[in-house]
């Protein structure tokens, strides 16, 4: 007892401090729990912690397919100051010697190192151009806008709306050309337009396995059309049989992913792309990959994906490009390369992740903004559309070049 | 020495008592928070919670908006500050609700303008009907963008609200939803919308707790509207009932506009339920209740939030007695702001405000206040609405706003029971956990 | 007694006959006056009851099967002339030495054009109403292959290396490109509206395609017609040249040096009140020119003269020396010869502003028109001999080929294609239809606004004295004999009335047709104008899934909510088969502020897909717009409950509706349904 007393006597201050700190920590925990995290400060592009948290890839086939991953740099940026009609660019499409950019204030065309803008006054359905594709057959440019679908053919604008045509809805998130057919993902269902027969198709919950008619992305490949249905996962349409099937999140819950790699990560899908027999699916909850047999999921905590919030994606051969709210990621099944902007010194960051190893390299040039909305590649060049300007990067033949 | 020991003992005792005094509430708080899963979900109601921990919980954190826009300089030549409104204004069975919603929003605008608008510039409401032909909601939001609104309020119908939200994201327009209780609306990670009305998840939990744990029913038949409100609304109820160990004995549907429900009621009778849950709009539900009683079904009836309506009482009359529903607020509370709103609204529009008017009023006030604080910049208005600080705990006429990480309102929800031809409101009782339930049932 | 009885019977009989005759005469006068809307018609029963017989023995007896030469090609050595006999579905081969028809090859329905390969051994013929090409071996004179095209294949051209074939799909407004090695269609390029002709530039770098109809334009604006330029290397459209205030660009030609590309065209003043006709200049006719220099400057020049118009320019050919152009004016039976050096000089000395002024100048043609050569009825296709010495002219309604010496500019020969020698009443009517002789100063013929007896897609200010009042969308004349009344407001109870007094008062502003001519014109309109097969949307009669769903929507009696649709607001009430018109007047809520009050004659829906724009004033650009823009109050059928995919289905069904002859069963079914309901 005496010892005890002595102990108390000696350590009374320490004990008091401990007790006080316990109290304070309890209080602070309770306060934090009640008010949640303040993201206002986080809004300013908080850097993602890159560490060795990445779990090893499990799918051996992915490794087998992986090829050498190119690294891009020498970023050149274009904004209103350079001739863009608006800084906010929704999409970009390389078309031979020119580059087409869909902005919030019209279509911008970069040719011979100058920008030219086309707006609703010229015949665009709406100045908000969300998606662009070019028909390989005819060279016609198809523009998905906030106010309808426009075909731009050798200078002539032809507009299809839900009022003058069979278009499902005027808000067109994605347009693609598939041979003579044009497919759209709209706010009122997916749609198809046969440029030969002029027949429109509308695909909604009334005739396809969707819960609701909201669609966000569409792509073609392997004799199929894949539709990113908002809340309905991925809808697959086989052209030959004209049959639909769907791929949904097996756990059926919006708030969780129960098991990794059990199917598409989430039913709210934002984009689809198909290349090399692989279907890639973007969500605001991560990335999914489907090889026709197995699904594999990628999240920011278990892979080199920089953010789960994926605005758009596009596969080019073995490489898939991911436009996220924290930069541009690219992935070939084995290696991740992410391009970010260093807010402190305006330089760029290249983050390379392979298995559990992550390396960050500083680059002298940077993408124009980390909120990336669109991407397109051709040969050794990549173009991206961002929340503030568009950027053009090129393959760094010598990785040290430009770094 | 003895004195010293006593002194020490006393000090320790005081300190211990003080510590215990402070620690108890903290531990109590922590204890409660430990139970709080996403959406106020108790442990036993967590999806797959009894069997498997989820690989990823998507709404543990907040989705930031990292895009550009905060740097945009506000215009200096404005003559009005436009705020959009999207609701069912004509051509829909929801039109009466949409009109109330519009009036609630307009009322807030009028009050704000009476106080000088935004730095002397009046606010202007830009109403848009979401029920136009051939899928209007998406186009209407585009029109709002062309009209240069700074934010908008909308809507009630699930489908239209979802569509509007998608466009709001693309156009980056802050959106406040005050009328669509679809739980999936805020489960999209779109950082451009907050909701200031409790959702069907909260309604479902309240009903499930009341029906199974308090009233001890075990065989529930559901008759719901064959629309998204009915389909999505019942989902959380169905799942929660299942997780409590009581799968629904029957779930059947009816179409909007139907007037004869004999077939469905016969099926319900055959399923021998000991209570019935109705999820749909007031008119059809009232007719169903009448026909149920007519066909000899005397089981207690529980229902969704839209049943708390004058129309239901008028059509169902005495048959509505005992009907228990949820409601996202209590319009009969003796809160000065609420009382004043009810009175002024009645004077202004010649009718009592309903749940949509009241939440629209609160929602519009959130937008107005956000504009006042953030200025005329959409991204900054968004930042404010979603920062979990500025409006966390906001006291509106509909109660306290508590936003979860997905910006869903998980504040309190009320329940009502029809007694003597009126809706009697009572607070939702705390959810009874498995442990408490087991204790109760063990002698 | 017996005699008296006989007398009584005879006189009684005579009295009854007289009475009957008087009554019959009275009825006949009333009937004829009602039908013709005049009171001095000679009461020739045959006018209506014989000449307008469409089938049966009488029809066979009074009508003939004509050839109607339309387009021509010459063998590379010039020894054989290949003639498209449009009405005989045949390719005629003429020996240019003897000027005799030496062979006839059966081709597909309504052939349009023929091209011959450089080796002279193979020909391709486009069958406009069969949507295909025939490949013909000219040695064996056999059809050796059939290539499926887009809709309404018209002109065909080879790429310079003859590896590819470009086909102008006139109905679907495209150009199909075929790989001749694989005989496959590799792509279709969007062309202008209703393109018909194409020609490669002399250097082979590009092809130009002319079109007849204006592009879809904002309501109430003048026509804008596209000339499409296709880059031969990429086989993509590289430019779309828009000729403003012009249309009906039927054909085009390059000068041998390529310095000029010239197309025929018409400049309509459709938005000017039609009273302008009696002041002239309502329709002017001429050429559109594109210079290879001057950044591709575009010019329009008239071939008309003050107080004399040369209507409906059709084909154009240019002499091998590049000095002269020859234009067939099918509305006035004239070949105009143009001095291209004068044109070059005019272009060289004129600013764009000056040239714009010339585009409306009736006197400028005196500078470059060097000769007007008369031809037989309705000259169409032209071809020059390889040495340029002879011009062959297809005289379509003469069944002959005129041969003109290009040095003397005189007709030196006429090749008889051995068609029927007799000119039937209907044939005479067709000549009248295609000729401008009855219009004040020959400004236009029926054909001008009704090319192919169909419609030109323009909206006219009919008879109104004020700008923009009473605008009327041109209506088709195909198969209209059995569906009176006529005009949008249904004021004309018969074609006699439509094309009689009213015609001269409002449209031609000259003396009206005499009764023989009127009989002939009516006979042609009633018997000679058929709907093309609807190969595009309903080739076999088997409806697509969407069309079947749309048919249900068309015949529905209840809304999506289960509410009964009032009979007068159901589609099939006003649009019952076989013509899909009940021939009654109705108010569908589409009267505009600029219209005088009127009800609308329910229009027929056969082949409705090729009649854009829609509504009486052409305000609906597409079928969809009928319901998305002009039916707010469900007056034009209850449609506002429909989902978009249902509307699409309905439109697909409407586009599938073809000629009335296919809907006899539907009539019975429809009547049975109605009876059942009643």
What do these predicted ranges mean?
Chain C
Residues 76-77, 118-120, 160-161, 202-203, ...:
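Residue-level detector of Asp-centered blade-edge/turn motifs that repeat once per structural unit
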Residues 42, 88, 130, 172-174, ...:
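A detector of repeated loop/turn-to-beta-strand junctions in beta-rich toroidal repeat architectures
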Residues 66, 71, 209, 214, ...:
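Periplasmic c-type cytochrome electron-transfer domains
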Residues 62-65, 104-108, 146-150, 188-191, ...:
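Surface loop/turn motifs at the tips and blade-to-blade linkers of beta-strand repeat domains
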Residues 4-5, 19-75, 88, 284, ...:
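Short sequence/structural segments immediately N-terminal
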Residues 95-99, 137-141, 179-183, 231-235, ...:
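Short loop/turn segments that connect beta-strands within beta-propeller blades
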